[in-house]
Amino acid sequence: MSQPAKVLLLYAHPESQDSVANWVLLKPATQLSNVTVHDLYAHYPDFFIDIPREQALLREHEVIVFQHPLYTYSCPALLKEWLDRVLSRGFASGPGGNQLAGKYWRSVITTGEPESAYRYDALNRYPMSDVLRPFELAAGMCRMHWLSPIIIYWARRQSAQELASHARAYGDWLANPLSPGGC
């Protein structure tokens, strides 16, 4: 029996203590031996990112998960800084930048609005697939495989049972992320 893929879960939430949904989602990940949970705001409250350390973490894992709330149609500021600095030319892209080629990228997003708000004719004017396009493009730039995102809409309004169900499904996927049908 083969070992499950090593997963690096990059968690980015500037107000993590107030996010019930994200804590519930993280709990199963913390109990899995193949998952490294890396809380960016806990490690870099001053935004001074240790780029060589982060790049080493990326090299050591096959699946990279970006878990964060949707902030202004993007990600929290520290994760944006992390993406710009760590996924540098020569490491992740451009000449010689093949360190992440063949790895897997999955975004796990919580939102403050219902799924119905993400349509061309709705409040946000665009579907979530369009909103997340920059992340998909970044994965492509790094020659990574883009896995369909996991999105928890209206996270604050999810019942405890709904959040527990999402967390179980997420934990099951994290335990064996590259199994047939698991992507």
From Swiss-Prot:
Organism of provenance: Escherichia coli O6:K15:H31 (strain 536 / UPEC)
Subunit organization: Interacts with KefB.
Protein name: Glutathione-regulated potassium-efflux system ancillary protein KefG
Location of this chain's protein in the cell: Cell inner membrane
Keywords linked to the UniProt accession: Cell inner membrane, Cell membrane, Membrane, NAD, Oxidoreductase
UniProt record similarity statement: Belongs to the NAD(P)H dehydrogenase (quinone) family. KefG subfamily.
SUPFAM superfamilies to which the protein is assigned, alphabetical: Flavoproteins
Single GO BP term: positive regulation of potassium ion transmembrane transport
Major enzyme class: oxidoreductase
Single annotated GO MF: NADPH dehydrogenase (quinone) activity
Superkingdom as given in the UniProt entry: Bacteria
UniProt-listed InterPro entries: Flavodoxin_fold, Flavoprotein-like_sf, K_H_efflux_KefG, KefG/KefF
Recorded topology in the membrane: Peripheral membrane protein
Catalytic function, reaction form: a quinone + NADH + H(+) = a quinol + NAD(+); a quinone + NADPH + H(+) = a quinol + NADP(+)
Gene3D superfamilies: 3.40.50.360
Record lineage: Bacteria, Pseudomonadati, Pseudomonadota, Gammaproteobacteria, Enterobacterales
EC number: 1.6.5.2
Single GO cellular component term: plasma membrane
Function: Regulatory subunit of a potassium efflux system that confers protection against electrophiles. Required for full activity of KefB.
Entry annotated with the keyword Kinase: no
